[in-house]
UniProtKB/Swiss-Prot annotation:
Protein name from the UniProt record: Transcription activator of gluconeogenesis ERT1
Region (Disordered): 1-172, 196-331, 464-509
Alphabetically ordered keywords of this record: Activator, DNA-binding, Gluconeogenesis, Metal-binding, Nucleus, Transcription, Transcription regulation, Zinc
Cellular component terms (Gene Ontology): nucleus
InterPro entries for the chain: ERT1_acuK_gluconeogen_tf (IPR050335), PAS (IPR000014), PAS-like_dom_sf (IPR035965), PAS_13 (IPR056751), Zn2-C6_fun-type_DNA-bd_sf (IPR036864), Zn2Cys6_DnaBD (IPR001138)
Compositionally skewed regions (Low complexity) per UniProt: 42-67, 89-117, 142-162, 233-254, 288-297
Polar residues composition bias: residue spans: 16-26, 75-88, 127-141, 255-278, 303-325, 484-507
DNA-binding region ranges: 174-202
Record-linked Pfam families: PAS_13, Zn_clus
Compartments (UniProt record): Nucleus
Gene3D superfamilies: PAS domain, Zn(2)-C6 fungal-type DNA-binding domain
């Protein structure tokens, strides 16, 4: 059997030429029954051992592809049964050949002139494994290359080293690889830039330095660069912003464009829609004409929708809108360039929304008392849109009314009444024969532009006109408009109408609006003054520590006179739970500490008063000894007790017996508990007439800076069912 196996394992020597000397050798430790001379006398056995070493060092073949058998080696039955992995069967066969002491004469004759280091069987196995799995052969031959006697690297190891050098991460990536977040190499130009055709611009990328690592000079340079970029951006925006001449020329271009038919292109329709809106903007900011009676070049943008008519004194809304060509009823004085959104469409949309929310509705202007000359003169009281995004009053319409304007019916009174709370402004009408409007800019001066008249305003003051014409009392002559405008800049007086031309039906409206604005401002100022005085009084008065022990003495007297002995014992037990901790925390406190705690308590009460005034829930705030300090108006309505009757008394005086007992037991349990300081339960309140009000309520225990229970906030809701 051993001779037959030797015949099967006898290799057929191929001709390799000069490549035979460059092939690395393999070796196995000798079997205990085989000596070194015996291995030299059996080349076939040594070739099988070399093949076994090669197979043992190579990874197993995948399950999907069966590894082929070496040449001249027939598969055994065990290998045929497991064709998906022929390595175990081949190994067993080679082990039998390796440690077999006999070999056939044919095998000895075939391998007589071949040295063990240059076995053709091992070379054929190597070639077959290389053809099957190149990656496996590379990993197999890479190991003996390092331990070979010649020391010459194989091509597979050279390719591996070159591949690993390509995948090696560079110390600093080039600019293009850094932007693309790809792995670069140390060569310049790098391989990726060469492939992409970017070899000329391949350079080391700049690493952004952290701000905390920058020096003072670098920080200053960075700040200057940011300022320069910001200035350049503003310059570009100002350069791209249309000038007043261009804005005035847009309506004429629009009229000429409307007269010629255009293609129904979506982009052209969108551009025309935007241009039409911008034309309305241009009309809103146009300056008044130089003539005393003539309207401004774009005054029709506002006045065409005005429901005034010279013949019948007024028209309906549909007719006014049809005469205007579908103009919107609100003010469209907006400029997209004032909003820095980076997109013209976004800025335009924001400007439109701001104008819709804050503009003036021209349909609110009355029609009584209008003269035929009103249609030919710009309307005073029409206000441009308020630029809320910029936080300033961008513009107030500087078109002065020459004749016949009703102050109460104008849009300015309505807008001033609407924005009186936020902008702290108002309007008034001075009984003077002429009218005018001051040009108001943004900033602090804009907030004081429209003021409520004081008693110092007399009828001796001369009117101020901003228009370039119509300076006399009748409005028919021409005056020095520029000098009067400069005088208007020095005075904060606004004249909105002529007493001889006012409509008597609108005088009460203007007077009521002015009185309401003035009273609201005065009330707000009084509240602020009282609030500041109360805060100052808290820190200025000689505050004494609050006598808390008297509160507990009053509690014992109250429950002894009202409740039975068992109920009194329940309250005493509740007090015994938390009073020792309370006394222990108060022991190290000095008198100054107690004064500080009392001032903090009084200052906190002021904040609770403000908070409760904003809430609609019946709320009461009391001390830890139940003295009521703050009462909400809703609690007074719920219990029918007045605020004066509640202040200074104890909260348990307005509860029934069971509610009082439950409150003290819950307070004793949660007074010094850190997990839960709020309790939700039910109670029953007592009205002055003795009726009971069942309520669901919650109380929260607040502590001071020394971790003492300082106050309790109670919220009550009546149970209606």
């Amino acid at each position: 059997m051993s001779s037959a196996k030797g015949d099967k394992l006898a290799p057929r020597p191929p001709s390799y030429g000069s490549n035979q000397s460059a092939t690395p050798t393999y070796s196995l430790p000798p079997h205990p029954s085989t000596t070194y001379p015996q291995r030299h006398q059996s080349p076939a056995s040594h070739a099988a051992a070399s093949t076994l070493a090669a197979l043992a060092s190579s990874p197993p073949a995948s399950s999907s592809t069966a590894s082929p058998h070496p040449p001249n080696v027939l598969p055994t039955p065990s290998s045929a049964s497991t064709s998906y992995n022929a390595r175990p069967s081949t190994t067993s066969t080679l082990n039998q050949s390796l440690y077999s002491s006999s070999a056939s004469p044919a095998a000895k004759a075939a391998t007589a002139g071949i040295s063990p280091s240059g076995s053709p069987l091992r070379k054929e196995v190597h070639m077959s494994s290389t053809k099957q799995t190149p990656a496996a052969s590379t990993s197999t031959l890479a190991k003996p290359a390092s331990s070979s006697t010649t020391g010459t690297p194989t091509p597979s190891s050279a390719s591996k080293e070159s591949g690993s050098s390509k995948r090696k991460k560079a110390t600093r990536a080039c600019l293009h690889c850094q932007k693309a977040h790809l792995t670069c190499d140390d060569s310049r130009p790098c391989q990726r830039c060469v492939k992409k055709g970017l070899a000329e611009s391949c350079m080391d990328g700049r690493r952004k330095k952290a701000k905390y690592l920058l020096d003072d000079d670098e920080l200053e340079e960075l700040r200057r660069q940011k300022e320069a970029k910001k200035a350049a951006k503003q310059a570009v925006q100002q350069k791209n912003a249309p000038s007043p001449q261009q804005r005035q020329s847009r309506p004429s271009q629009q009229d000429s464009a409307k007269s010629t038919p255009q293609n129904s292109d979506p982009s052209s329709e969108k551009a025309s829609a935007v241009s039409s809106i911008l034309d309305q903007v241009a009309g809103s900011i146009a300056t008044p004409s130089s003539s005393g009676h003539g309207p401004s070049p774009h005054a029709h943008d506002y006045l065409s929708s005005n429901p005034f008519d010279s013949s019948n004194g007024g028209v309906d809304d549909t007719q006014a809108s049809s005469n205007n060509g579908g103009a919107l009823p609100f003010d469209l004085s907006f400029d997209p360039s004032t909003h820095n959104f980076g997109s013209e469409a976004t800025s335009l949309e924001y400007s439109i929304l701001s104008s819709m929310l804050n503009g003036t509705d021209l349909q609110l202007m009355g029609a009584s008392g209008a003269s035929p000359d009103l249609q030919a003169s710009p309307a005073v009281g029409v206000m441009n849109g308020w630029n809320i995004a910029s936080g300033e009053l961008d513009a107030i319409l500087n078109i002065s009314m020459q004749q016949n304007q009703v102050p109460g019916a104008g849009g300015m009174d309505t807008v001033a009444a609407t924005y009186s709370d936020t902008a702290d402004m108002g309007v008034y009408a001075d009984p003077q024969p002429n009218t005018g409007l001051q040009d108001v800019g943004g900033g602090d001066s804009a907030l004081n532009a429209l003021e409520v008249p004081s008693s110092q305003c007399t009828a001796k003051e001369e009117p101020i006109l901003l228009s370039s014409g119509s300076g006399n009392g009748n409005g028919n002559g021409s005056g020095s408009g520029s000098g009067e405008a400069q005088q208007a800049g020095s005075n904060n007086q606004v004249d909105l109408g002529s007493s001889s031309q006012r409509s008597t039906s609108n005088e009460p409206v203007a007077a009521d609006i002015n009185r309401a604005i003035a009273s609201r401002r005065v009330a707000r100022q009084q509240q602020d003054t009282i609030w500041r005085a109360r805060i100052a009084k808290t820190y200025r008065d000689n505050t004494a520590p609050f006598p808390y022990p008297e509160g507990y003495h009053f509690l014992i007297k109250y429950v002894t006179s009202k409740y039975e002995k068992q109920d009194v014992l329940r309250i005493v037990r509740a007090l015994a739970i938390f009073r020792p901790s309370l006394i222990a925390l108060q022991m190290p406190l000095t008198e100054e500490d107690e004064i500080f705690v009392e001032r903090s308590f009084q200052r906190t009460m002021l904040e609770f008063e403000k908070l409760i005034s904003f809430s609609g829930t019946p709320t009461v705030v009391w001390r830890r000894t139940c003295e009521i300090c703050v009462v909400g108006a809703e609690f007074c309505m719920l219990t029918q007790w007045s605020k004066d009757q509640l202040m200074g008394r104890r909260i348990y005086e307005f509860m029934d017996k069971n509610s009082t007992l439950d409150y003290w037991e819950n307070f004793a349990q949660h007074a010094f508990e850190n997990t839960t300081q709020s309790v939700m339960t039910t109670c029953t309140l007592v009205k002055p007439d003795g009726k009971l009000v069942p309520c669901a309520w919650s109380f929260t225990i607040k502590r001071d800076i020394f971790d003492l229970p300082s106050l309790v906030v109670g919220n009550f809701l009546p149970i209606l069912s």
